[in-house]
Regions:
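N-terminal flexible segment immediately upstream of the FAD-binding catalytic core
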Residues: 1-121, 139-171, 319-329
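Short, surface-exposed ligand-recognition loops at beta-strand->loop->(often short) alpha-helix junctions
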Residues: 52-55, 290-296, 345
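Residue-level signal for inorganic ion chemistry
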Residues: 64, 123, 240, 341
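Short, well-ordered beta-strand elements within core beta-sheets of diverse protein domains
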Residues: 106-111, 275-276, 285-292, 339-344
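Short hydrophobic alpha-helical runs that function as membrane-insertion/retention elements
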Residues: 131-132
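FAD-binding subdomain of flavoenzyme oxidoreductases
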Residues: 162-315
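A conserved active-site cap/scaffold subdomain adjacent to cofactor or substrate pockets
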Residues: 293, 308, 332-346
Length: 346
């Protein structure tokens, strides 16, 4: 059985079904601003990419299949390639290579905390590195199949961890780590709530990925970074399962939640999170402001933030980003910097 993958380009960002060719204006902008060559370079198709052979032995595959079932373990090149890294510029450039590429040696799709614990123990005994995988949108190398002293690497796909629970009294939601951001918001909206976390990777990233990377989003000015929304989390390690943050607050000193938030999966596998949510706002007011330059814009936005009770979205683009945004909209632009604000309420 094929291992499920998110509907995203294997060698780029976005859903391939929604891809559009670059306009002449954007192509000209890339040439002038970045020195991009006028010639198109043929990249390999997914069928032309060559991967280094899997280092998993038949015994390794059998041990993993004994935990999750043979249909939830794959060493097929297509499954390995789609989990070979994230979506940084370096990741995507590597995918253009016609030389043999590195990739995890296998993909394992567990369905419970117990299965993850057993997988970690199997891999520990067999010296197999484990890389947790959610939506595949990392831009900091968190998904690289680094072997080091290990004989092989497996990608631990968490897409089956998609449970949702809502405590309306405490305004907290318990979400599975493999739940994609859009699906989480859709399910919460059915009950009149939202998480309100919208990073640029939102369409493909998962709840666990938000936590493992300490994600920030466009609403972070109002609701805080993702780690500020976390009230509790469950982590599976080779030594057992940790349920952290059982109470809303604690007077204890060290907070073990901080060890795993932003850890990129290095210390354990996050499988569920309890998160602060809020009612969907009745009103949203969108406003845009222009400033002569970035310094003046930054001074104005700093004053707004220091006053308190500011907008949910408070974003200032520098001169270059403002110019590119104008070009993408087919506008010539008039220079300066653009600020976007969103106010929410009843």
């Amino acid at each position: 059985m094929p291992v499920p993958v998110p509907p995203m380009k294997w060698d780029g960002w976005g859903d391939p079904a929604l891809a559009e060719p670059l306009s002449d204006d954007i192509t000209a902008l890339l040439k002038n601003a970045l020195g991009v060559s006028a010639e198109d370079i043929d990249a390999p198709t997914i069928d032309e990419v060559r991967l280094r052979p899997s280092a998993l032995t038949e015994s390794d595959e059998g041990a993993l299949a004994a935990v999750v079932g043979a249909d939830q373990v794959s060493t097929r090149d297509g499954d390995r390639l789609r989990r070979a890294g994230g979506k940084s510029t370096l990741d995507l450039l590597r995918r253009k290579s016609r030389e043999p590429q590195d990739a995890p040696d296998g993909v394992v799709v567990p369905g419970s905390d117990d299965e993850i614990g057993e997988i970690l123990n199997v891999c520990s005994r067999r010296r197999i590195a484990v890389v947790p995988f959610g939506g595949g949108t990392s831009v900091v190398g968190g998904l690289d199949p680094v072997r080091g002293e290990f004989g092989a690497v497996v990608s631990l796909d968490l897409r089956r961890f998609d449970a949702v629970g809502l405590d309306e009294i405490s305004a907290e939601a318990t979400l599975g780590a493999g739940l994609p951001g859009p699906r989480a918001e859709e399910l919460l909206a059915e009950r009149g709530y939202e998480l309100g976390h919208y990073p640029q990777s939102f369409r493909f990233a998962t709840i666990g990925g938000f936590a493992a990377t300490r994600s920030s989003g466009q609403n972070s000015a109002g609701y805080g970074r993702f780690d500020e929304m976390v009230r509790g989390l469950r982590v599976v390690t080779p030594a057992g399962v940790l349920d952290l943050g059982r109470a809303p607050a604690s007077a204890a000193g060290p907070d073990l939640r901080e060890l795993f938030l932003g850890s990129e999966g290095a210390f354990g596998v996050i499988t569920a999170l309890r998160l602060q949510v809020h009612p969907v706002p009745e009103v949203r007011v969108y406003e845009a402001w222009t400033f002569p330059d970035f310094a003046i814009g930054a001074h104005a936005l700093r004053a707004v933030e220091q006053q308190g009770d500011g907008p949910t979205v408070l974003r200032l683009s520098d001169e270059v980003e403002t110019g590119i945004a104008s070009a993408l909209e087919g506008q010539s632009g008039s220079g300066g910097c653009l600020a976007i604000t969103v106010f929410e309420g009843t």
